[in-house]
Curated annotation (Swiss-Prot):
The lineage of its organism: Bacteria, Pseudomonadati, Pseudomonadota, Gammaproteobacteria, Lysobacterales. Keywords: Lyase, Molybdenum cofactor biosynthesis. It comes from Xanthomonas oryzae pv. oryzae (strain PXO99A). The gene is moaC. GO terms for biological process: Mo-molybdopterin cofactor biosynthetic process. Homohexamer; trimer of dimers. The active site is at 135. This is Cyclic pyranopterin monophosphate synthase. It is an enzyme of class 4 (lyase). InterPro entries: MoaC, MoaC_bact/euk, MoaC_sf, Mopterin_CF_biosynth-C_dom. Its EC number is 4.6.1.17. One of its GO terms (molecular function) is cyclic pyranopterin monophosphate synthase activity. It holds the Pfam family MoaC. Pathway: Cofactor biosynthesis; molybdopterin biosynthesis.
Length: 165
């Protein structure tokens, strides 16, 4: 079996194979951004009802509540995922809109100036916003599905991924 290159190594394991937080103290402070996306798929009748009601449910504004929950999640990512560094979030923006008749697209873009990226924060924000949409709509149906959730782009650090957002 060929030896793994240093770049292909799992960064949250030390040489003894024990979990560890990555030491970012030697990294340069740079602008970082990431955009993640999650989708919620509704049964046709539920999607039609949500469209007719302007994305409002008995619990209130679905989009507004999802944005608030997603933003809170972005700021608390380091409390949810053990080896994420606490970051000074400079910006967190959501775009939530229909992507077809039955699919709600949720995009979360996060920015900061720091030594490590914000991919996990963007993924967490999009995920929690999608979970919140589910919670707001579950009285209508439990036949909704969430996913895929994915990283769309990231900027800053060693490499950029995806189109600039």
């Amino acid at each position: 079996m060929p030896a793994k290159s240093r770049s292909a190594r799992l960064t949250h394991l030390d040489d003894a194979g024990l979990p560890t937080m990555v030491d970012v103290s030697g990294k340069a402070i740079t602008a970082r951004s990431a955009t993640a996306e999650s989708r919620v798929r509704f049964p046709a009748a539920v999607a039609a009802q949500l469209r007719a009601n302007g994305l409002r449910s008995a619990k209130g504004g679905i989009v507004e509540t999802a944005v608030i929950a997603g933003t809170m999640a972005v700021k608390r990512t380091h409390e949810l995922i053990p080896f994420c560094h606490p970051l000074p979030i400079d910006a967190c923006r959501f775009e939530i809109d229909w992507a077809g008749e039955q699919v709600l697209d949720i995009r979360c873009t996060v920015r900061c100036v720091h030594r490590t990226g914000v991919e996990m924060e963007a993924l967490t924000g999009a995920s929690v916003a999608a979970l919140t949409v589910y919670d707001m709509c579950k009285a209508l149906s439990h036949s909704m599905s969430i996913g895929p959730t994915r990283l769309v782009s990231k900027r800053g650090g060693k490499r950029d991924i995806g189109a600039a957002q």
